[in-house]
Each structure stands twice: as C-alpha cells, then as structure tokens.
Regions:
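Fe(II)/2-oxoglutarate oxygenase catalytic core
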Residues: 1-292
Length: 292
C-alpha cells in the first residue's frame, strides 16, 4: 500500500514541469488574443486597408489632413513647417530647408551686381570712420517687386506664415555677402531710443535666410544666450556663445523684444569671420508696426 502511494507521488512530481509549461502557454495565448482584439477594436471600421483591416501610415496621415472652415483672410490648405527651438533667451528658431537651392541662387544672382560696402545706423558719437571695422561685409537692399523670378515674394509669404506677422511689417531684404575675413561684430537690431532717439516703430524680430553654405566660419553668434557673458567684460569682437552654422536654404528667426514689448538684451548677435568660402545671407527685419 505504501509503495503504491509513493509510486503515485513520483508520477505527480514528474508531471509538475509539464503543468507549468501548459500554464505559461495558456497565459501567452490569452495575452496575444486579448491584445489583438483590443488593437482591432481601436481601428476605424471603414473597410480601408489590406487584409486583416490594417491601414498604412500614409492613409492615416492623409485622413488627418482635414481642411477646416476658415475666415476670409485664412488659407484653404494646410501648411507644414519644421523648426527647432535653438534658444529661449533669446527666442531663436531654426527652420531647416526653408527655401530651395534654386531660390537661394536666384536671389544671389539678383543681388550680386548691386553690392556695395555695408553701412551702419550710427549712434550718438559714432562716425563712419570709427565704426568701419564693425561691419565689413558688402550688401544691397531688395524688395520682392525687383525680383522677376518671384523667389523673394515666395520667401516673404512663407516668412509671414512662419512668424504670423504680415509681410507689410517687414523691411526690404538686406542681402549680404561675407568674404574671407569679413564679419559683423556683436550688435542689436533693436534701436534703443536712448542711443538712437525716438522711434516710430521697433525691430521686434529678425529673419535670416542662408543663401549659401560656408566651408568654415561665418556662424551667426549669440554671446549672451542663456544670460551668459553678461558681466560687462565681453569683447564685442569675440565669437562665443550659441553659434548657428550657415547652411544653404536654412532660415533663422530670433526676437529682439519680449512678448510684452520690452527690449531683450540677450538678443545681442553678430556674424563670425568667414575662414574659408563665402557667406551669402538675406536678412529681413520685422517691425512691430507697418510704418517706420
């Protein structure tokens, strides 16, 4: 009698691994079935897609592009613009591949024959002679009406969409060329009334479209980014802080004013010397009023 009980106990002992395997198999099967059912229940039942009701990513994206009712001044299409926030102090954003190579080269071609040494808005006590080393580029001012290719007009319209500021608030494009060794020392685009006198309007933001690649140097720099180097000892000729490397077709937007309309001191910026190659850039200053 004792031997039979022992024999049964041995059989039960030997079958335990099998029982565990069966339990695990049942659990996994149940998990798979429940997951499949939940996934299928989340898919729209509209018959779109291949076998099993699966739908491609393209179909999802296409269906998401719903055109909403818009006002008289709105658009009847959906705009998509990629951007990267480079800084919050100052507020600076980079728009990669903002314009095509063809548009950039068309703008360069239009500007090349009109270039002249770049000038400065002088503050009290400054003269052309004592500021001649501050900005050594050459440039010209162009409006979209002067461009028969339509490239500047296209940039202007897309820029208005990116900034949500009407194109009428923008000054003429300042197209600049920097050759080897040429640069623009750190400065503000904002006109401080204490230095420049009363202003009808202010440059609230600056929009830069890089028209060419630069092999080395030529970065747009923000030495006070993140409130750094603001101890009063900064040399305005130094190329330090946040530096944005020019790349053809990319655009840079930064604000010289806070949303409350006050001056942002961290918006100090400049153009590092070009070490190798040539730098072309189209700058448009955006005003807080459409008259200045």
């Amino acid at each position: 009698m004792r031997s039979k009980v022992k024999e049964q106990w041995i059989c039960c002992k030997l079958s335990m691994p099998l029982v565990l395997l069966l339990c695990m198999a049942c659990f996994l099967a149940g998990f798979y079935v429940s997951t499949t059912l939940v996934t299928q229940s989340m898919l729209p039942q509209n018959g779109i897609g291949g076998a099993g009701g699966r739908r491609s990513l393209e179909l999802f994206e296409e269906e998401d592009q719903i055109i909403f009712e818009h006002g008289e001044t709105g658009d009847d299409d959906i705009s998509e613009m990629r951007y990267q926030i480079l800084s919050w102090h100052p507020r600076a954003l980079l728009f990669p591949n903002f314009a095509s190579k063809e548009k950039c080269e068309a703008i360069i071609k239009l500007a090349r024959s009109r270039l002249a040494p770049s000038s400065l808005a002088l503050r009290k006590g400054e003269t052309v002679e004592n500021t001649k080393d501050t900005r050594t580029s050459s440039g010209t001012f162009l409006t979209s009406k002067q461009d028969k290719t339509g490239s500047l007009r296209w940039v202007e319209q897309k820029m208005a969409r990116a900034t949500m500021v009407p194109a009428s608030h923008g000054e003429a494009f300042n197209v600049l060329r920097y050759e080897i060794g040429q640069k623009y020392n750190s400065h503000y685009d904002f006109f401080n009334p204490a230095e420049y006198g009363p202003q009808k309007s202010q440059r609230m933001a600056s929009f830069l479209l890089y028209l060419s690649d630069v092999e080395d140097g030529g970065e747009t720099m923000f030495p006070f980014e993140g409130f750094r180097n603001m101890n009063g000892k900064y040399d305005y000729k130094q190329c330090i802080g946040l530096r944005v490397k020019p790349r053809q077709g990319d655009a840079l937007l930064f604000y010289s004013m806070y949303p409350n309309g006050t001056f942002d001191k961290t918006s100090l910026h400049g153009s590092c010397p070009v070490i190798k190659g040539e730098k072309w850039v189209a700058t448009k200053w955006i005003r807080d009023h459409d008259s200045w």
